[in-house]
Amino acid sequence: MNKTPTTLIIMDGFGIAPPADDNAVTLAKTPVLDRLFQEYAHTTLSASGLDVGLPAGQMGNSEVGHTNIGGGRVVFQDLPRISRAIEDGSFFRNEAYNKAMDDCLKNGTALHLYGLLSNGGVHSHIDHLYALMRMAKDKGLQRVYLHCFLDGRDVSPTSGKGFVQALADKCAELGVGKIATVMGRYYAMDRDKRWERVQMAYDAMVYGEGNHNPDPVDAVAQSYAANVTDEFMEPVVCDSEGTISDNDSVIFFNYRPDRAREITRAIVDPDFDGFQREFFPTTYVCNTEYDATRLNVLVAWPRIAVKNGLGEYLSSLGLTQLRIAETEKYAHVTFFFNGGVEKQYPGEDRVLVASPKVATYDLQPEMSAVEVCDKCVERIESGAYDVIILNFANCDMVGHTGVLEAAVKAVETVDTCVGRVVEATLKMGGIAMVTADHGNAEDMKQPDGSPMTSHTTNLVPFILCGAGTELRTGRLADIAPTILDVMGLACPPEMDGKTLIVK
């Protein structure tokens, strides 16, 4: 007997904003979404700040969004958690940080601090780096090397020079730390097994190979002069003595896991085969749990369990579920949606569709959405699943390029695919929900007219297709309780989100 599915479609990076000449969402031709908004109950959801467990005014992101959606509650995020630890002093008593620094003192080796040099708050925060530098100074460490991954994506594409200058000033102020390398996140923070990029980052930090410039601020300025913005800056070695060597300690201060895994494995995994390199022992600290193996690493801030999230709860009831996305968002509909749990629950199937191998997604704004859609429709028609969680990556990933025309095409691609998935769901007698995890594509320009590549704090849509009802406004944490409500299921006590359906 076929199941009647409840399908959740997450349009990653699709926010709501007034029509404007830089709003790819309203510039795009979206006949499907226009019709869904006309025919079905819809509302708006908050996807940023305190409503998703971030500081007030902080833009949301895909990790946070999926964690809140899957958790059915506001999940306190790593950024405020670590920042509060700095304020109350517990940061400086952290066992993993102390172990890494004490090993340097014991072995006479160097400490390396690396991560995304930004105040964007999505993957890291520069204040956390400054706190680690103060801690190293207080412990009397002499050799502290800083490896800077420039952002240009969650902040302005040319803000990196200012961050590098601020870091250099902080080194002078504290009397600790030397900037050893500077590079764009494109190389150091890949997440799609583009090992040729990761190798360039690795070779700079470990072997001192790449472009050389003793002045890190000038190195960034020269990159700008060559029309290369922060994200794409090729690795530059600023201090040839600052390479990572045997028995050194490394602290990776990024707290978001997905873009921290590959360079970490290149350093710590003796069986790594992404490219040729030597393996050597280090005391390596991951700021959070980057993956479940914890291979040869310490974890500074272990993940707080999200008990009885939607995936775990559905499984406990003996229900079946499907998670489907392309590579760029696969971790979000699985690992993050499950509250940082790597394993599949009984009854949970997963489908991964490869993202296209292009340098930047403005070159192929359709990405792999059609294939994701095809496979999802096929699974819906199989009648095998009670719940389907689907992510279309286009609006976010193309929005990050800052190319408006491509973002418009991305929105139009998603519109078509959403229509097919909703139609297939309704034909099976099911209910489809269309939403987003945060904004992006609806705001593509800075006030000065330059490209805007970051997320927004805008509200996101929520459309309930197949159930005539009235909806209230809410937040992402209310989606899971709404799914359970339309399925006639009670929420587990751990979920403090509330159904969006007006009773």
Regions found by a protein language model. Name each.
Residues 1-503:
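Feature captures the catalytic ectodomains and active-site-proximal regions of enzymes
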